[in-house]
């Protein structure tokens, strides 16, 4: 039976640490941390995600600033909104909720966010900081995965890690974080030949491919640690990830569930980035350095 990598429980524990940091720092800072979430259009899933982030902010004591613009918004309007948030002294973190409506390019909008307020860690400068091992906001989902591994005493050093997926959102920063933790890292993608032969070499397997249950027992060596980043709705109802959990449960040493695994940690790391940005701006002491991969 695989060890359950319980992201929901860990997120709750980390929220308590963040709330303590906010309580202890508010007197010196003169205000709580602020997170602004920019949502464009009326995608139902995005609305749910934003509502969950607002609830998490409230639990920790982070002030939430929502900006909801219509899907017909022009890029110039979005850029002006981002520039206003960059200049707003109440805002320490800015998140552009993705995906954007068809016809809008996220690249120039992400580039317009102040790198020090980049709550999602997706600005080009922050990806460069990650590559060089310099301080800065970290991409939330990979940072959440690293926190989950640490919480269970799983040290990537010297291990073979395979990341399935090479997106700038998850796959590429995930590979960099594992490499920084001294793992030997291989990245698989849609052009990889004989995927199973590669993934069976993994001591740590992180799957962020965006395909429901594509990883089965034939892809995993006994005793591997498997982190499932995917989340999908089944046609018959319910949720599943990128791995077939039923097949991997008796095989893996550790497995993250869907839901309740990586998802809650992604939201928590968004708050970590925001609280750390606030702490840096106001030169506050903190004990959150272990959360930054």
UniProtKB/Swiss-Prot annotation:
Keywords: Amino-acid biosynthesis, Histidine biosynthesis, Hydrolase, Methionine biosynthesis, Multifunctional enzyme, NADP, One-carbon metabolism, Oxidoreductase, Purine biosynthesis. Pfam families: THF_DHG_CYH, THF_DHG_CYH_C. Its EC number is 1.5.1.5, 3.5.4.9. GO terms for cellular component: cytosol. Transmembrane segments: none annotated. NADP(+) binds at residues 165-167, 190, 231. The keyword Transport does not apply. It catalyses: (6R)-5,10-methylene-5,6,7,8-tetrahydrofolate + NADP(+) = (6R)-5,10-methenyltetrahydrofolate + NADPH; (6R)-5,10-methenyltetrahydrofolate + H2O = (6R)-10-formyltetrahydrofolate + H(+). Belongs to the tetrahydrofolate dehydrogenase/cyclohydrolase family. Catalyzes the oxidation of 5,10-methylenetetrahydrofolate to 5,10-methenyltetrahydrofolate and then the hydrolysis of 5,10-methenyltetrahydrofolate to 10-formyltetrahydrofolate. This is Bifunctional protein FolD. It comes from Synechococcus sp. (strain WH7803). The gene is folD.
């Amino acid at each position: 039976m695989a060890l359950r990598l319980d992201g929901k429980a860990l997120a709750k524990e980390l929220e308590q640490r963040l709330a303590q940091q906010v309580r202890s720092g508010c007197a010196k800072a003169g205000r709580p941390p602020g997170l602004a979430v920019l949502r464009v259009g009326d995608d139902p899933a995005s609305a749910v995600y934003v509502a969950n982030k607002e609830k998490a902010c409230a639990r920790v004591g982070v002030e939430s600033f929502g900006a909801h613009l219509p899907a017909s918004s022009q890029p110039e309007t979005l850029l002006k909104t981002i520039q206003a948030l960059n200049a707003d002294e109440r805002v320490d973190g800015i998140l552009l909720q993705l995906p954007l409506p068809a016809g809008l390019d996220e690249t120039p909008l992400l580039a317009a966010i102040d790198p020090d307020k980049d709550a999602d860690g997706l600005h080009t400068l922050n990806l460069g900081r990650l590559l060089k091992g310099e301080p800065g906001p970290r991409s939330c989902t990979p940072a959440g995965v690293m926190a989950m591994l640490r919480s269970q005493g799983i040290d990537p050093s010297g291990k073979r890690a395979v990341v399935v997926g090479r997106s700038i959102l998850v796959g590429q920063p995930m590979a960099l974080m594992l490499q920084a933790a001294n793992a030997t890292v291989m990245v698989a993608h849609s052009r990889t030949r004989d995927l199973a032969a590669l993934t069976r070499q993994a001591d740590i397997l992180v799957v962020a491919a965006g395909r429901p249950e594509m990883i089965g027992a034939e892809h995993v060596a006994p005793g591997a640690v498997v982190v499932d980043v995917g989340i999908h709705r089944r046609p018959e109802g319910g949720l599943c990830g990128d791995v077939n959990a039923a097949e991997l449960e008796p095989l893996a040493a550790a497995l993250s569930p869907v839901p309740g695994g990586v998802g809650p940690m992604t939201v928590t790391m968004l708050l970590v980035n925001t609280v750390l940005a606030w702490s840096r701006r106001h030169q506050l002491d903190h004990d959150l350095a272990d959360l930054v991969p």
